[in-house]
Amino acid sequence: MEPGTESPTTDRQSQAVDTLSSIAEREGFLATGDPALQGEAADRGHAQLLDYTELYELWERQQWATQDLDFGQDRIDWHQRIGDEERFQRMFGLSAFFIGEQRVTDELGPIMRACPTEEQRIFLSTQIADEARHVRFFNRFYDEVGVLEGTDGLADRLRATEEHLNDAFGELFDGMLHSRVDRLAAEPEDTVAVVEAITLYHMVIEGVLALTGQHFIIGYNEEVGTLPGFVEGFGKVARDEHRHIAFGTRFLTDMAAADERYREAIQRMLAESLPLADKVLDPPWAAADEDWEAFGASKEETHAFAAQCLSRRLKVIGLA
């Protein structure tokens, strides 16, 4: 490498930092308290974290309704402006979010009930409502745009879109997450299990996977000028997710400071889940050992963005 030049890895990290700065400028995003959006302060391990009551109050101020979205132009775009091959490639992202939102809606209840304080449980009650709204958002988009013609109803659409997922998705959501939540439902007094579940749910599934996908899907549609109703709604979904991740960061920061056992639980869960989450990001139509591009971003760019987001949050928690 020539003196004065940056390595590709350093360049991708710099791009990720710039991207996070632009996301923070979206309306209401910085207010969520997600450390990933707090720039150099988070890089130094310092961030302004909202407490659980403040997160609840923010939820009250950031309400939105799926019925207010207009998908008229989206239907035209999907059937007339987006070609067959691109529609097929886009289905990976759409399916992962549609089914992912349904899965996390179903799994959050036991986590909420097992949280130690009433303030934490109240906030997670709002998150259950958010996740259900996200499922309704995707169901309405699929229905009114005609994403899967011939399907009838939510359950039918979920079954039909599942074929576009990769194997790692099922292993993470239906295997690892479901088993952790089942354990928690049986032993709600196990605080270590709560810490593990929130690490997997909020740090990995929402923080690494969901927000990475949301960023690139929204940005690509804005760049090419497609699906304006979807972009509007998905932006609101992303804002909700940043608020959820801010809760997870607050919770794990508090728990890591309280007991070394909880720090170890966070680290153990990350070590177990991140290799699988890494595979979830790869589209099923791409070979495992090759680079790919989806929604205008390469494999390396996508993974670098996810890593930068996680790094900032872990520094604030005190683990990086």
Residue ranges and their predicted role:
Residues 2-320:
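Non-heme di-metal
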